[in-house]
Structure formats: C-alpha cells, structure tokens
C-alpha cells in the first residue's frame, strides 16, 4: 500500500489541478492522483450530502492521515503549503501570496469563460487577449517588481505563477510572445521555477501522458480556434 499521505482528484489535464500537484512535485513529495474521468465524474455527481466534502467540481484533496477532504484549489494550496515549507510565516506576506493565487484563479476563470459556460467568439477573444490578458500579465509583472513573488524563498505564489503562465505558454505557445512583451520578468520566473529538477520531471511526465492539453473539452477547442484565427490574421 502506498505511504503517500495525500490523494488528489482532478481531470486528466493540468489546468487547475496543477496548482496543487506542482507543490508536491516541487518538493519531491509522493502523492496519489486520481485522474480517471469516470471516477471524477461519479464523485462530482453525488448529492452534496453524499460527498466527503460538498463541492461542485475538482480539484479535491483527500488527506489519508486525518481522513479529511478539501475542495477549492486555493483552500487546498493554503492547507498544504506550510507542511511543504512553501508558505511565509508573516501573516501579511501569507495574505499577499493568497492574493497572487486568487489572481491566478481569476485568470483561469476568464480564459475558460467561467468554466466553459460559453465559447469564445472572435470579437470577445480579441478584446480579452489585447486588453484583459495583457493587463493581467502587467499586474503580475508589477507584483514581481514589488517582491510579491520571485524572492529568495520559494512560495506557493511562485509555483502558482508557474502553474498559470508556465503551463499556459507550454500548452498554448502562441501566447508566449504576449508574456514576453508584457511580463518578461514573470516569463523568467516561470523558467526558474520550472527548472527545479523534480518539478521539471513531473511536467515532462504530464506532457507524455496528456500532450499539450490545457483545459480540455469544447472550451479548449474554442481557445485553439481563436489562436489559429489570430495566427491567420498575422502579427498583432
């Protein structure tokens, strides 16, 4: 029987689950992953009073030592990070790391149009890519300049930034030029965090398993269609 303390439930794509899995990978801590679509869907579709923790969708973390279950990516990250030496001791610095992580979560929601509630049309996509996404990148770049991330002590905020932009530009390489233009320091930070050997190995294994799948489903098809249209239209 595995001695891993934690089991992570998430779809077979990186997207939001990698904000949790990258914590373990960065520290070389073994954990269990349940990525089967049918099992995640079965658990998600249970009535709230039948679930170990009432939730709408994964990621979900099961602590095999305590028997406790937790949902919501930011809550899971906050729970795990002190034990992995990835959380600051100072309360304000901890809150600032959470601010960065919640910003990451907001970007994910915008990219996938609120969990795929609607698909992209080109007018909306162009507005998002040229205005909102570029502003988000500048917000993160300013956070780096102010020391919210990128300090000598690695934090869950640093890993969150890598999970957001490192994964985004790996899976959707058309957006790397945007990141270099608007947030070159964040681009460099992603490279530095992604070079941690145990994390780099995990990401490589994920790519072998899933290719460059990003968020999956119809919404990923919609995003890729918009990027292809951008490419066909020439330089922005």
Where is each model-derived feature located?
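Acidic carboxylate-rich catalytic motifs and surrounding loops in phosphoryl-/glycosyl-chemistry enzymes
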Residues: 35-36, 203-209
């Amino acid at each position: 029987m595995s001695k891993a303390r934690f089991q992570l439930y998430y779809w077979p794509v990186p997207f939001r689950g990698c904000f949790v899995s990258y914590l373990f990978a960065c520290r070389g801590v073994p954990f269990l992953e349940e990525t089967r679509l049918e099992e995640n869907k079965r658990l998600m579709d249970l009535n709230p009073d039948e679930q170990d923790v009432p939730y709408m969708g994964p990621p979900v973390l099961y602590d095999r030592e305590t028997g406790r279950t937790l949902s919501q990516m930011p809550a899971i990250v906050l729970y795990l990070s002190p034990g992995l030496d990835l959380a600051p001791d100072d309360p304000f610095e901890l809150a600032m790391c959470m601010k960065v992580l919640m910003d990451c979560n907001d970007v994910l929601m915008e990219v996938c149009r609120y969990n795929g509630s609607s698909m992209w049309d080109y007018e909306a996509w162009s507005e998002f890519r040229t205005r909102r996404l570029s502003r988000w990148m500048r917000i993160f770049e300013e956070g780096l300049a102010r020391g919210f991330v990128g300090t000598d002590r690695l934090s869950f905020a640093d890993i969150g930034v890598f999970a957001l932009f490192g994964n985004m530009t790996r899976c959707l390489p058309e957006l790397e030029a945007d990141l270099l233009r608007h947030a070159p320091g964040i681009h460099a930070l992603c490279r530095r965090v992604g070079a941690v050997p145990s994390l780099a190995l995990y990401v490589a294994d994920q790519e072998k398993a899933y290719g460059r799948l990003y968020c999956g489903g119809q919404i990923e098809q919609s995003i890729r269609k918009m990027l292809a249209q951008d490419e066909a239209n020439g330089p922005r």
